[in-house]
Amino acid sequence: ANTLRGNMSASDFMYFTLGFIFYKYLSEKIELYANEELKEDGMTFKEAWNSDDEELKADLKEACVQDLGYFVEPEYLYSTIISMIDHKENILPALERSLKKIEDSTIGQESEDDFGGLFSDIDLASPKLGKTADDKNKLISDVLVALNGIDFGLKDAQEIDILGDAYEYMIGQFAAGAGKKAGEFYTPQEGSQILAEIVITGKQRLKTVYDPTCGSGSLLLRTARS
């Protein structure tokens, strides 16, 4: 992440890094889900997808979209991109396809609005990433390898807290770099916590929470976690 920050503005840095964090999370989430679904068949997600059982693959894809809201084939997972990096390959075309595959898998589904444009701010052809294709590939590869160390704790059902922490950290870093403009979209954690406590005081359960000036969503996230 620090490598990216040296090449671009705080806002660009945030969009790239957050996008890659979400990509890693979605990849690990679906791989864990699919492996669990296939446990009785004695197969892993990758093994099932490389098989000739088209009915099995169709059922698995349908289950993923229904339960998770999206689908992505094993060849487009974050771990696959990391493997390409290990083999010194150019990852940019594959990475671009991977991000598009996730968004496209939700078209016509209830989750389409949630995933539409999720990675639209990631421009892998941006000159800010380097002068040459090799420069861009190296920079993005370095960032993905660095982010690969994040453990979302999916098996321990702690993914919401960890993903939320990562999101709030990135938003906070952007706000620090954006100065006064940050007030247009970001409520500092201290202010968010006070508002959240006011909202939940005396209530056992909240059905809905509305932020009329929602920007980054950090206030809603803080309320959900209080």
Indicate where each model-derived feature is located.
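Non-catalytic, mostly N-terminal accessory regions of nucleic-acid modification and defense proteins
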Residues: 1-204
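Conserved class I S-adenosyl-L-methionine
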Residues: 205-213
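Conserved SAM-binding loop of SAM-dependent methyltransferases across substrates and taxa
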Residues: 216-226
